[in-house]
Curated annotation (Swiss-Prot):
Glycosylation sites: N23, N89
Main location: membrane
Keyword DNA-binding: no
Name this protein carries in UniProt: Inducible T-cell costimulator
Disulfide bridge map: C42-C109, C63-C83
Gene that this sequence comes from: ICOS
InterPro entries recorded: ICOS, Ig-like_fold, Ig_V-set
Subcellular location: Cell membrane
Organism, as annotated: Bos taurus (Bovine)
Amino acid sequence: MKSDLRYFFLFCIQVEILAGEFNDSAASEMFIFHNGGVQILCKYPDTVRQFKMQLLKGDNVLCDLTKTKENEDTVSIRNLNVCKFQLSNNSVSFFLYNLDSSYASYYICKLSIFDPPPFQVDILSREYLNIYESELCCQLKFWLPIGCAAFVTVCVFGCVLMYWLTKKKYPTSVHDPNSEYMFMAAVNTAKKPAPTDVTRNLELPGTQA
């Protein structure tokens, strides 16, 4: 259920790309839609062999990837911010998912070149990613919590009502001490036999010999 709602919100979110101040000719290549998210492409010259590529959102570093060559056969790649990335011979792609309106900002690809010397820092591209949500999604985000709360309230009220009706239909048999009617103990009405240890002899007058 939660995943369905998440995909629905991702479907509602629309992304508009506006060209930045740098590399206007490559404005359409920096942002690419990818599996409900955005792929941000940062290109660098083919001659660069060791470098650090940073993806900045405004002044904040979102992704930081460093490629160094320890020897002829070993290449070390460090991804400090644990961003999903894809590295090629002349570009680094970073992937952002679960976007909302808070992600709207300028995104900057910042390249620090270690090899070939000299060391230098370049801003490769800077573009604005404008994310806005449709009116339907805004209304849905407002009414969905209210609807869920109302649904829970109705369910609780229904359960209480069902319990009350069931208790009223099948009352318990517990004796009420304040009741007008009292339970009476069973009384044995059978006659007890006469005592056999007492015997009286009655003699009629004139019957003696």
